[in-house]
Amino acid sequence: MKILFLALIAFFITSCAKMNSDYFNSSFAVEETKINYNKIADDFSQFIISYYAPNKTTFFINEDKNNRDFSNYFINTLRKKGYAISNDNSKKDLTFLSYQISQIDNENIVAIFNINESKINVIYKIIENKLVKPNITSFNFTPKTKG
């Protein structure tokens, strides 16, 4: 519990900091290999559907080249929900999206999603080699109005 509290404080502080050049670069840095991380993509795509209308939202994702498996699964999951994905950041009306997935310790994974200038943090517990989502925290999350 102490670790989660410290992690939340750290995320609060970083969410107030100005954007850096890596803000929209996705990264995937975890040590545990026995876990199926696709749950993170599934959870995010289910969460975001309430705030950004499929078929009316085009995401620009600067994907992580080091973990193609997760990146491809994440992009395909969004496409299956009806979202368009663009590789051209000069197009109009893009919604910029990136993710940073990292391991806090042996029991916790954090997934941070940057959507335009908003941030969503999700902390997952590792229980019996599975990810369990006990909590979603969002800092400065201003969703686009659906419709």
Question: What name fits each language-model region?
Answer:
Residues 83-94:
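Short acidic low-complexity segments
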